[in-house]
Amino acid sequence: GILGMNAGPYNEVIKFKARDFSMMRYLKRHYPAEMAYIQPPKPSTDGLSTINSLIPMLKKVENEYVKYYTKTFTSLLTSKEVVTGLTKFLRHKKGDNLIGWNMLEQVKPDGKIGSETLAAMPILNQSSNEENLICILQCALCCNKYSVDINGIYNDAVVKVVQEFQQNVGLTSDPMVVSGEVNRRTWAALLQSKGDPDRKANACDCTEKLDLIKAKALKEAGYNFVGRYLSNASDSNKGITKEELDIITTAGLNVFAIYQEGSITPEYFSEEQGKTDAVKAFEAARVSKIPNHEVIYFGVGYDFTEQGCREKVIPYFSGIVKAMKDKGSWYKVGIYAPRNICNIIIGAKLAESLFIADKSTAYSGNLGYALPDNWAFDQYETETMTGNGTKFQFNKVIASGVYAGFNGLTRCGHENYRDCTLHD
């Protein structure tokens, strides 16, 4: 959209193009110094939808702009310029009057936003009259697939869209968030995949086995769900057991199951490997007495391009689905991966539930991509818990409520009840 930041593969925002290009022309004319900060994006085909699909909309704009944008059009939703472009412009528009508003210095090369910038992010609501900042907010909403006019006015329509965004990214229960108002929580969620790392989590995942002290400490800290791994990698002892599941249940937590062993290089992924991993995950789930019909999230720990995802990850998940079907479809297939990979796999109908790996803000599959719809879990920051005689590390996660996980008392298979202790 505006600032040369086109919405790429999302057809829903194609309708914004003519308006955004007109806004670009307006900004160049009235704010030449500020616009000098924004460089035309480098051509790329990664995540790029076909330019021909945009031509009808582009024809509504003056000829010189059509020519310019058809030459430079790219999907910045897969580019590291997306955050730096918006934040540089935002800092320059805001000026140096706001102490600590160090956008240029605080935005890291990997797309992370520094703590000083987070602390200095402005509050915007219907009483705000800072047209320039509201324009940037509206632009950021467009880049996240939300339809809003870019006019610098914080009207009822903007309030409604902000509320919808806050709901969809899991901010509504945060005590720091005011519905329809934008502060650091909402700004961060708009500008980087992990959002504000300081926000409170209601779930977590960890590779470390939990004893009762650790599990109770998590519950007392407000965590209700914990992601645990089904099996042990060659150099680890991270696999959940039936005994640990009972301990977690006693502490009042629910579990969601993760399977990930060697999936951190592109060479790992193939249809045959998917079949192998599905069988291993199935067998581990049976041994640990995981109830029937629960989700197993298969991890993708590599930053694939869209092309790489189609060449490697789709065959991998095709193998998983085939093997699970051969085993009787006792478990649902989920995916644990960056945003764009999740979108591609769910679009190919190869997974039923999404665990978003948003912590890696520098991943090309995260930076600039909107949070997928109907996500179940969103991982965003690493935390270390100390106290009660224990110290351990885990990842902070937001649970949307789409999937509640399970515990040792969950009816196996739900309506198709079968005692999970009878698993072979």
Protein language model features and the residues they cover:
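Substrate-binding cleft of extracellular glycoside hydrolase catalytic domains
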Residues: 1, 209, 235-308
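Cell-envelope/ECM-targeting effectors and their regulatory/trafficking segments
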Residues: 1-225, 229, 424
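Functionally critical loop-and-helix segments that line ligand-binding/catalytic clefts
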Residues: 4-44, 199-206, 342-424
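Conserved, mostly hydrophobic/aromatic
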Residues: 5, 218, 248, 298, ...
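Acidic (Asp/Glu)-rich catalytic clusters
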Residues: 19-32, 214-222, 238-257, 283-291, ...
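Loop/turn elements at helix/coil->beta-strand transitions in domains of secreted/extracellular proteins
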Residues: 32-35, 95, 143-144, 221-226, ...
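Active-site cleft segment of glycoside hydrolase catalytic domains centered on the general acid/base Glu
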Residues: 303-328
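Aromatic-lined carbohydrate-recognition surfaces of secreted/lumenal glycan-active proteins
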Residues: 325-344
